[in-house]
């Protein structure tokens, strides 16, 4: 399961190539910071076509010292959430629901896969997502 998860994660990294850089100010990122009370985890969201079963998009919710969403090459935005190069900050449960609702429709399903990880692993994945850039 871990190999499959990390293989999918590697696909996310590669799919971000070519996006335009976005860099929210430090104050906006600090203000939006959200720490989820649940266990440290990483959740892969895969958007699948209901017609063919093929993958159309993927995003990674990282719940570590804070909760962020890595959404490479995505079009999802929220005016109250700052973004830095495909990393969205301030991901509350309501924003997770909004993200899923944005992608799910009659022609697309959203599949969620979560694994619990140590705080160190969650923060390492988060640091790599933040460092990756658009």
Name each model-derived stretch:
Residues 15-16:
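C-terminal motif of bacterial Sec signal peptides marking the signal peptidase cleavage site
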Residues 26-29:
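Alpha-helical transmembrane signal-anchor/signal-peptide segments
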Residues 100-134:
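Active-site nucleophile-His-acid catalytic modules used for acyl/amide transfer and hydrolysis
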Residues 2-7:
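Sec-dependent signal peptide recognition
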Residues 19, 23-24, 35-111:
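Glycine-rich catalytic cores of cysteine/serine-nucleophile enzymes that process amide/ester linkages
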């Amino acid at each position: 399961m871990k190999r499959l998860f990390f293989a999918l994660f590697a696909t996310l990294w590669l799919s971000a190539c070519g996006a335009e850089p976005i860099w929210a100010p430090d104050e906006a990122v600090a203000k939006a910071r959200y720490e989820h009370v649940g266990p440290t985890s990483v959740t892969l969201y895969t958007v699948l076509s209901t017609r063919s079963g093929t993958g159309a998009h993927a995003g990674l919710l990282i719940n570590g010292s804070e909760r962020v969403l890595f959404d490479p090459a995505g079009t999802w935005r929220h005016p109250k959430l700052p973004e830095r190069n495909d990393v969205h900050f301030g991901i509350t449960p309501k924003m997770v629901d909004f993200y899923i609702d944005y992608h799910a429709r009659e022609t697309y399903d959203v599949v969620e896969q979560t694994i619990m990880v140590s705080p160190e692993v969650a923060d390492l994945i988060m640091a790599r997502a933040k460092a990756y850039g658009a």
